[in-house]
Amino acid sequence: MSPLPSFLTSPPPSVGVEITSDRVTAVSLSRQASGWIVSAHGTERLTSGVVTPGLNAVNVHDARALSAALRSAFDKLGARPRRVALVIPDTAAKLSLLRFDKIPAAAELDQLIRWQMRKAAPFKPEDAQISWVPAAALPGGGREFLVTLARRDIIESYMRACADAGAQAGVVDLASLNLINAALASGDTTAGDWLVVHVAPDYVTLAIVRDKEVIFFRTRQLEGDADLADLVHQTAMYHEDRLSGATFARVVLSGASARGADAPADAAEKHARLRRGLEERMGVKVDALDFRGIAAMRDRISAGPDLLDALAPAVGVVLRERVA
């Protein structure tokens, strides 16, 4: 699989950071003889209104509060990082799959992709930040391309918050893409198509992966658990009718424990309830995304779903450049 798209790249950092509408999380990974280790992590809550993710509106409303939360999370790592890989909410950007039945020449491909995305952007073309990678091959020699579009000033506002906290963001990426990175890096070899369900505080993203390539990606606002079950059912029907799919070989759920839960016990129950509801609706086993197959937790025998959910995107963005 080609690396999933990133807005900005440079040599990979060993610290991943995720910013959501209600918290910031920092994770430090280290390489040991036994493999990758989550050597430290820290989370700080954000008060309502500090960050409100969106494609075409101000996202960071209180830069000082966001930077302070990032500094507090960095302090919990033991040493403040100078460089980080940054994960931002899916709703801060637009991700599309562009299809070319005949792949243009390399000199034209980038221009065509950028032209198509800028044409559909709800803001001035010159304000667009665009990143793309090859995705699934098509019969007859064509290919899909996974393209991410965002407003440049929105991306820069998240990066600036990190810089004000003392860390440069060498990589900027989306949350759900890095859940996929974490799942792929964990080495599951299940044959067939699989579904990733990412439940954030204010949205849900559904992604379908086939042969390690994203073939479907949809982000929607989420009002309640019933809406989630309906969206998953609709996605399963689309998968069968339009993508020539059968029953999903694997369904991975992440983030459910953080939605509406105020304590670890609440988080575990929330995750279990959503998982059972999806299993009943789909008739398929639903697993929590567990990255510990590739990055073990240091000095921790077990980790609850709330912790795994909180760390997974930041772990995924660190592993994306390090695990084939």
Enumerate the predicted regions with their spans:
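Hydrophobic/aromatic-enriched cytosolic interaction surfaces used to assemble or bind macromolecules
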Residues: 1-324
